[in-house]
């Protein structure tokens, strides 16, 4: 992501785990700092907390311009209607990247993306290169809009452009 747009991207990592934990990092502007934050996270079983992530994004956007929300997930255990309400009030395009092919998750993620005028893209489990390409494309879009995405040779940009135009 950071290599796609050197010096032009700030990222905040928001994650949830366990029964009630949903945390946000400080904003970082380089890949090493983000990797360091990600290395400290461990997985714990618990329900999804997508609604909390959406609400956090809305609050951060009210503090200052958030260009995009990138959500990567493989499950959804909340009431879709509650997520749709949160998505309508988001004020930020949501880029939803789904690992796997659960039809309920697909339907909900697709609707959230549509409500926020963002894309929903599936990628194959274990296909880190697909996710890498999608994240690079989001970085290009967040810093340069459709013009930058259209000029990109990144395979992820093609996937996003199909839904953003």
Q: What spans do the regions from the language model cover?
A:
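VWA/integrin I-like adhesion module and closely mimicked acidic/polar interface patches used
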Residues: 75-115, 123
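A general structural motif
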Residues: 8, 64-66, 91
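Von Willebrand factor
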Residues: 1-26, 32-72, 76-79, 100-110
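Hydrophobic/aromatic beta-strand patches that form the interior of the parallel beta-sheet core
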Residues: 12-14, 70, 95-98, 119-121
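A cross-taxonomic marker for long C-terminal extensions/tails that follow the last structured domain
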Residues: 69, 73-77, 81-82, 144-153
